[in-house]
From Swiss-Prot:
This is Morphogenetic neuropeptide. Keywords: Cell cycle, Cell division, Growth factor, Mitosis, Pyrrolidone carboxylic acid. The modification Pyrrolidone carboxylic acid is found at Q1. May interact with SORL1 (via N-terminal ectodomain); this interaction is impaired in the presence of SORL1 propeptide. Stimulates the proliferation of neural cells. It comes from Homo sapiens (Human). The lineage of its organism: Eukaryota, Metazoa, Chordata, Craniata, Vertebrata. GO terms for molecular function: growth factor activity; receptor ligand activity. GO terms for biological process: cell division; G protein-coupled receptor internalization; neuropeptide signaling pathway; positive regulation of cell cycle process; positive regulation of membrane protein ectodomain proteolysis; positive regulation of neural precursor cell proliferation; protein localization to cell surface; receptor internalization. GO terms for cellular component: cytoplasm. The keyword Cell cycle applies.
Amino acid sequence: QPPGGSKVILF
């Protein structure tokens, strides 16, 4: 899992 939970934040 990405370091935001289930979201991928690029900015």
